[in-house]
Amino acid sequence: MIRSFTGWRYIFAVAIFMHHYQIDGKSVLQAGGVIGVTFFFILSGFLLAYGYKKRLMTREISTSDFYKARAVKLYPLHILCFAAVFLLGIRNFVTADLPKAVLNLFLLQSWVPSPDYYMSYNAVSWFLSDELFFYLMFPFVLPVLLNGSGKKIAVGAGIFAISYSAAAALIPSDHYHAYFYINPLSRFADFVFGILVFRIFDQRRQATVGHTSRAEAGAILLVFATFILFDHIPKPYHYCSVIFWGPVAMLIYIFANTSLSTNYPPHTRKIHYVLHKSVGPHRKRACRYKPDRAASFRKDCPVAPYNCSEKPVFVFI
């Protein structure tokens, strides 16, 4: 784990939370969801490549061991949240809901292009559904992306980006969310791009040491400019993550060797994950602001589910 990302993970987790926080039915930070999720998918590819490059490619660990470790990362909190939401709504459960429950439980709901499925139960678990697909593909795409011809990969990435952007402009607007924001195949591009960012970082590792504060400030300003200009981006591209690859990649690349996380508690990188995944069960109720009853948010709220679900399981990894 590159510690310099802990702070940024926390910042983008808060951005996603603010995206779900509404005042008078309007999101406080509309860009927080799209850009925040893109950041986490790209960072996921980067960090997995960083942590598993040698171990997988030298067969220090097997593919099955990798899958076991990832399953432990995904499922404990997911099952806890799923059970909580399921039990709260069990009185309204009907037989017709069974397929949704099964797909959600096994993190397959994102493959069905219908909000009734991918937003069922703990709605934000669609993110985990995508991550599950990424993890399954990771051992196979890693050697190809790290050892393949740089020119061929660059040409392929360019062709994909152009095709992806064109598709975003042509697809009916009512399909944007399902096919570009949620679908695992579409978001897999973010994950792959994160691995490619790691490839560049790894090849220029010595050159990345000692980045100037000017470069860091430039990366931060570029990301904030993206947030500010988000509303001016044509709506077809709001869910087209290719638009945000540049700013996010620059941020990750430049801060790969900094120590932004040194002022954060050791468990913060775990807490951001719990915060993101636990927004769903209560977001409609707790994330709407009313003048007579302001919703409150305490930074220690996610600590309990982390200590009760993920932390005990990590002992066995």
What are these regions (language model features)?
Residues 2-3, 26-37, 116-130, 170-193, ...:
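Interfacial loop-to-helix transition and helix-capping segments at the boundaries
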Residues 14, 43, 79-87, 136-140, ...:
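Generic alpha-helical transmembrane segments of integral inner-membrane proteins
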Residues 14-21, 87, 110-111, 158-170, ...:
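Aromatic-anchored segments of alpha-helical transmembrane domains
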Residues 34-37, 41, 54-89, 96-107, ...:
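Transmembrane alpha-helical segments and their boundary/interface "anchor" motifs
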Residues 46-54, 138-146, 191-203, 248-257, ...:
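Hydrophobic transmembrane alpha-helices
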Residues 53-60, 144-152, 199-214, 256-271, ...:
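Membrane-interface junctions at the ends of membrane-embedded or membrane-associated helices
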Residues 110-162, 312:
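Hydrophobic alpha-helical segments with transmembrane-like composition
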Residues 191, 218-317:
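Alpha-helical transmembrane segments of multi-pass integral membrane proteins
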